Amino acid sequence: MSSVATIKRNIVPPHLEVKGGRPLSGILKVSGAKNSSLALMAAALLTKEKLLIQNVPQLTDIEVMSEILRNLGAKLTKTNNSIEINSESIHNVELPYELVHSLRASFFCVGPLLTRLGEAKIPLPGGCNIGARPVDEHINGLKALGAEVEVINDVVKAKVSTKDKRLLGANITLKYPSVGATETILMASCLASGKTTISNPAREPEIQDLAKMLNSMGAKVFGAGTKRITILGVESLNGTSHCVIPDRIEAGTFLIAAAITRSPLIIGPVIPNHLSAVISKLKECGCSISQHGNHHLKIIPREISGVDITTSPFPGFPTDLQAPFMSLMATAKGSSKIKERVFEKRMQHVLELNKMGACIYLENNTAYIKGVKELVGSNVEGGDLRSSAAIILACLSAKGNSIFTGLEHLDRGYEKLEEKLTNAGSNISRKFDQITSHSSFSNKIISEDNIDTQKNAA
């Protein structure tokens, strides 16, 4: 006699389990700015001396940039949240596709490579799929500085052909205040011959942080954070030690977490004027926000009402907080409208929020939101970094349990997120186990069929 038993196992990728509806309390610690850290790490290529960068968050994007620098010949030593970079022996001018395709900030290396080695080759970079983010402005800026640049088969090839292998100062006007283009031109022009001006540059705090470190290395950068940046080229740059500014996007996410869970919280360290637009909108929708000590903010949410926002470059409302703010508006009293003006594909969270009971209608890049009393836990998935953060906030406030997949996105930009939220009172945990009953994961589950166990009996 024999019998055959078939076991079917549904295997879910690493995910977060969130038991929603719990208030938060205490302090949420803000890490160093990811976007600033990436540019600062690339800037280490500009000097032959050692550079120490402190308050660097431990993220997958930072790991990718670290591997890129090692591939170019730099030596890195990491201790907790500090990175020492020695670029004295860089020799490789070509960045590998397998690293570049996942990190848009990899393009920051082009300017330093041109100034140090006179040449750079890089595949067109990747990053979050949130719409077209061409590097045209970066390339035009490098060309204005005297570099010869061509794009062949999606590979950017740049070189300096002057006798002394130095770029030449120029007057550059950006069509759009691109952060990446501003940082690329800023780094490339520090060692250029002569004076460079950037009109209509990005004014983000990360630009100011980069300029501050470059100046401590011996560069001559003036006007960062204003509508015109002036750079006087120098012969060489020295090493330095620099502490990264707090991450304003993480801080904003935490402020919104307090609001959506209707929980008083202390957030910090922060630089308040980096968050002016966000603080203004949170106050408008019903939150009390005040300075708490020298480097923290205290937020006390009251009844949350719908308010309209439109994203724009700094000092406007940041596009990186559009998705988290939409989660808040989904549970606000009344209606609201959110218009995305920076990226055209940054509404991937709408479908997931509606799955949780939100009432959001999307028309092109404008979301029309009718607030509901509460969201309901569900199986949800993040499609990019900031939409993932928005969905996690929704899960925290929702009634019932949620399962979130998309950790690869969260780990790019939020350091130890579940640990921080758990310390503040949330019930959120990272899981790697198998799940057998969540059918709505159909597009993510790997089914193992035909696992047969045969038992033979005489």
From Swiss-Prot:
GO MF term set: UDP-N-acetylglucosamine 1-carboxyvinyltransferase activity
A Gene Ontology cellular-component term: cytoplasm
Protein EC: 2.5.1.7
Binding site for phosphoenolpyruvate: K34, N35
Active site: C128 (proton donor)
Compartments, record wording: Cytoplasm
CDD domains noted in UniProt: UdpNAET
Pathway membership: Cell wall biogenesis; peptidoglycan biosynthesis
SUPFAM superfamilies reported for this sequence: EPT/RTPC-like (SSF55205)
Gene3D superfamilies: Enolpyruvate transferase domain
Main location: cytoplasm
GO BP terms, alphabetized: cell division; cell wall organization; peptidoglycan biosynthetic process; regulation of cell shape; UDP-N-acetylgalactosamine biosynthetic process
2-(S-cysteinyl)pyruvic acid O-phosphothioketal: modified positions: C128
Function statement: Cell wall formation. Adds enolpyruvyl to UDP-N-acetylglucosamine.
Family: Belongs to the EPSP synthase family. MurA subfamily.
Name of this protein: UDP-N-acetylglucosamine 1-carboxyvinyltransferase
Lineage: Bacteria, Bacillati, Cyanobacteriota, Cyanophyceae, Synechococcales
